[in-house]
Curated annotation (Swiss-Prot):
PANTHER family: 1-PHOSPHOFRUCTOKINASE, 1-PHOSPHOFRUCTOKINASE-RELATED. The gene is lacC. Signal peptide: none annotated. InterPro entries: Carboh/pur_kinase_PfkB_CS (IPR002173), LacC (IPR005926), PfkB_dom (IPR011611), Ribokinase-like (IPR029056), Tagatose/fructose_Pkinase (IPR017583). Its EC number is 2.7.1.144. GO terms for biological process: D-tagatose 6-phosphate catabolic process; lactose catabolic process via tagatose-6-phosphate. This is Tagatose-6-phosphate kinase. One of its GO terms (cellular component) is cytosol. It catalyses: D-tagatofuranose 6-phosphate + ATP = D-tagatofuranose 1,6-bisphosphate + ADP + H(+). GO terms for molecular function: ATP binding; phosphofructokinase activity; tagatose-6-phosphate kinase activity. Pfam families: PfkB. It comes from Streptococcus pneumoniae serotype 4 (strain ATCC BAA-334 / TIGR4). It comes from the Bacteria.
Amino acid sequence: MILTVTMNPSIDISYPLDELKIDTVNRVVDVTKTAGGKGLNVTRVLSEFGDSVLATGLVGGKLGEFLVEHIDNQVKKDFFSIKGETRNCIAILHGDNQTEVLEKGPEVLEQEGQEFLEHFKKLLESVEVVAISGSLPAGLPVDYYASLVELANQAGKHVVLDCSGAALQAVLESPHKPTVIKPNNEELSQLLGREVSEDLDELKEVLQEPLFAGIEWIIVSLGANGTFAKHGDTFYKVDIPRIQVVNPVGSGDSTVAGISSGLLHKESDAELLIKANVLGMLNAQEKMTGHVNMANYQALYDQLIVKEV
């Protein structure tokens, strides 16, 4: 089983409009509300793929109750309740544009943070892989993910970590390393304080920087150009076919689902990388975020090429 962790989930509200009118009333006919957050996108894709998944994280208030109720019934759920209210994230879709209004979210009390660590520790007993995704809510220390990774490592579980900025930096600088990280070029540049290109020789050098020591897998998304990956001392380039992109949002989360599934099933390097890329591409072909049409899985799978470089 795979445990997904979403520390700062949201109710994602979509308002489609033909035109967004400023300083006046905009009436919305069709409103969509879903359980949102990067980890919950991972959860949905794993469930649609057919893997057993357990979702956890922090929820609070009536919106927190709404969120848990709107997660697929096939998914096992064991969230931790806090006093603060789960946030809303609003997307206004007007014409070809998207305007977002994102709430900061609740501030987590220090005691709640400590109690969640105990909650997390108990959940580790029933899973093999942990996928931690997204931002930390206010109130938790910047190295909180390092604490989760430490507990998972002590329990002998694989950890896939998908976060960025100070939270990722804190994990990289700690002695407690995840199994997998999934930065893109922009995030690599931010971590190293210099521009990083998509040149394969440069990426090889970058991924051997001391900052990344001790991490088994580093998987770098190159968008339409595929993926570059380092597993131990071996480097791979994944070539992907051109596809018709409908909505790329959530493709990174779908990739995390594929990585987690590959670890769960002890797949070969090539199998893991292909599965991860295919699920990311399938998400990009759908209007709904964090959704894949498995009917198209094998056709895409057969088109991907993994090369050792």
